[in-house]
Amino acid sequence: MKTLHNNYCNSKQGYLPLFLSDCLDLLDPVLTFERLMGGIDLNKYLTDIPEYTTGRLRYNPVNMLKTVLFGFMTSGYCSLRELEDNCKVNIRFMYLMDHQTPSYRTFGYFINEILQDKIENIFNDINHAIFNDEHVDLQHLYIDGSKFEANANKYTWVWKKATEKFRYKLYEKITAEIEEINAEIAWSGVQITTNPEYVPDYLNEIVEQLVLLWELDTSTFVYGSGKRKSKEQRHYEHLTTFCQKLQEYIQKIEICGPNRNSYSKTDNSATFMRIKTDYMGNDQLLPAYNVQIGVADEYIAVVDVNHYRSDMDCFVPLMEHFKQTYGFYPKYPVADAGYGSYNNYIFCEQNGIEKYMKFPMFKKETKDRKYHEDPFRAVNFRIDEQGVMRCPNDKAFHFLYRKNVRGNQYGRKEELYECEDCSGCPYAEKCKKTDKNRTVRINQELTSMHQEVIENLESIHGALLRMNRSIQAEGTFGIMKNDRWYKRIVRRGIHSVKLEVLLVAIGHNLYKYQKKKMRNRTAA
């Protein structure tokens, strides 16, 4: 029988080549990665690792960092077990780790303890190296956000408004309890003051005073069936329970903070949001994080993780983060209709940023001619020679008053106008929905901003930017979620989640860089 295999070497006999690099192709991703990392000083982030006097010598921290980053580059998201396994069987990881095989616990300690406070600076240094090599244009920034489901149980919500309602009901119970106690201790001349609201320290002080007044011994309290509690014991237990419950409500409201209305019990940093991918099929809120990215020439230039459910509140923090990283604001931030608000437009004007963010009614204003030319819209009303606004029936609208818009940080005001007389108007059914004279709200400043945005985005430059935003910003999330299978947050806590998202962003940029280098060398 003819031999179809080589039999001149075996597992007990060494053979050439002796170096792993000789087994790799010149265009191999790990060699491209190694050349890029060679131009970055990684040692400065790894000098403060604590020294241990017992146990084995530590692994080379630079090799550990390269291995972690390369794992996220190749897999999108690389678990600790995958890193451990790759170091044992994958020749590329063997090359980076010099044949050493750290355990998953070692990788976990290195990521969670060593890289926690340094990962953002590492992300920025890698970006600077890539951007200088690729001549990335940072003046055009394509912004998008996506909600990633948190690693939290689904039915563990805490609602801020419900907690506040329960707290006020508890105040009423405390007041009723104190009034009952006052009636029983009237003989002593002691009166406990009732308040509209209470704090736990005040209740603890009341309990201490009652213990002294009644000379209570908690060791003599009775429990269980067949035993009757005294009035003093009942009042003591009620006040103690109220104090614990009040402390719980205060803690829940503090965790929510002023900028969100819910959180999860298993991940206090996660906020309940409505996610597009409703796999439960009941339109239910799920614990999630709002991940914001700014993309420049297909690379993630800036990334942020927020509690906010709306993208409008995420624009300014993302721009400030961009300036903190690169020293300037982008000239042309391009975003969808979720970012176009009065606050964001004013921020752009104050910092010399062009307005290329759509507003919520942008599509209807530009695509729906019937809506845009509707004669019953206040913005389409005629202005006569005296500057008075007149409706299609030629009735004058008189100024009523100005009012502040709630939740606006720049003091935005709306002007309210009322029609002089709508009785007998032939257009009443089309113009208004009530029997009263029609009133309209107008903000000329915001209307002029919307017109400026339309002119910017409808220009040739604006059309190209809109097209590029759909390709680059939304395409980046598409690659992360569907091509590289990162669809859900793994870690818990806002700091750990930011660490994880930054690692995924670094992996994406390295992946893009390697793909572009491969295409260029193949074409050459």
Language-model region placement:
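A ubiquitous short alpha-helical element
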Residues: K2-H5, E51-G55, H461-L464
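Short secondary-structure transition/capping motifs
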Residues: D22, G55-N60, F72-G76, L96, ...
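Basic, short loop/linker segments at the boundary and entry of helix-turn-helix/winged-helix-like folds
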Residues: L26-F72, Q444
